[in-house]
Amino acid sequence: MKKVKVCSPGTSANLGPGYDIFGLALSKPYDTLEVEKTEKGIIISVEGEKAEEIPTNVDENTAGVVAKKMMEDFNIQSGIHIHINKGIKPGSGLGSSSASCAGVAFALNELFELNLSKLELVKYSSLGEAVAAGAPHADNVAPAIFGGFTLTTSYDPLEVLHIPVDIEVLVALPNIQVSTKTAREILPKEIPIKDMVNNVGKAAGMVYALYNNDLELFGRYMSKDCVVEPCRANLIDGYLEVKEKVKDLVYGITISGSGPAIITIPKKEHVIDIENIFKEVWNCPVYYTKVGLGCYVEEIE
């Protein structure tokens, strides 16, 4: 095997009260990564969404950091060329950096037949997230690797719970700049016990709803975060207006990750109405998509 091409999905993290725990894989948008064996070194090339803004230096690129660590740990002597086609806009709140991290880990596992488990792939993938967010975290890379709905419940040791789900979501991507680091820095360092109780209860209810195929309950609780969303809502101009306008058209709505992307669980009969509201307020791209299966191999040579 000389070359492998992998599709790596966009993801939505937090989903309201599940801050830094919940993650959801999407069928679109997605990145594609081609990883090819070379004689030596790591070369990175990028095309697609905001490619000119993505560093190709190995130590500054999220995929490069992951690849370098894996190649060191497994004493891989050959080189590689990583070509990333960005279908996920960086800084979108849809796990753009995570897609690169997860995609390259998944590709190297296939290319060099490392036989790593999905949990081990999440662990390596999360290392690249430190470049984008300042610290390793797995709430996006976990669903990118596992697919479906994931809960990252511990980091030491790393524990990820996985629930396969069949849900359709409608995602808006406003043309607004939101820094992940800024969005994390504005969060409170301490919260009242009543807010903790609310979020723990709603998060637990969302898992219950998934097991009972109750979209109405899942969406209602997804919309009830009282810790993170109130801090970030004003970073996304028009969000509170949209939330009010679509409240009877969706089961739930919240900010995807750090934003600016907005994720909804739409009532099917109102998908067009919701899209029109998104376009009226933001004039932005909209994705109507299903929960995805995670990274997969598209081609092998």
From Swiss-Prot:
PROSITE patterns: GHMP_KINASES_ATP
Key words, A-Z: Amino-acid biosynthesis, ATP-binding, Cytoplasm, Kinase, Nucleotide-binding, Threonine biosynthesis, Transferase
This protein's pathway: Amino-acid biosynthesis; L-threonine biosynthesis; L-threonine from L-aspartate: step 4/5
UniProt: ATP binding residues: K89, P90, G91, S92, G93, L94, G95, S96, S97, S98, A99
Pfam families xref list: GHMP_kinases_C, GHMP_kinases_N
Keyword S-adenosyl-L-methionine annotated: no
Name of the top EC class for this enzyme: transferase
Keyword Kinase recorded: yes
Compartments in which it is found: Cytoplasm
Principal cellular location given in the protein's record: cytoplasm
Database matches in SUPFAM superfamilies: GHMP Kinase, C-terminal domain, Ribosomal protein S5 domain 2-like
Biological processes, Gene Ontology terms: threonine biosynthetic process
Transmembrane portions of the chain: none
Family: Belongs to the GHMP kinase family. Homoserine kinase subfamily.
PANTHER family: HOMOSERINE KINASE, HOMOSERINE/4-DIPHOSPHOCYTIDYL-2-C-METHYL-D-ERYTHRITOL KINASE
Functional note: Catalyzes the ATP-dependent phosphorylation of L-homoserine to L-homoserine phosphate.
The protein's name: Homoserine kinase
Species for this entry: Methanococcus maripaludis (strain C6 / ATCC BAA-1332)
Upper lineage: Archaea, Methanobacteriati, Methanobacteriota, Methanomada group, Methanococci
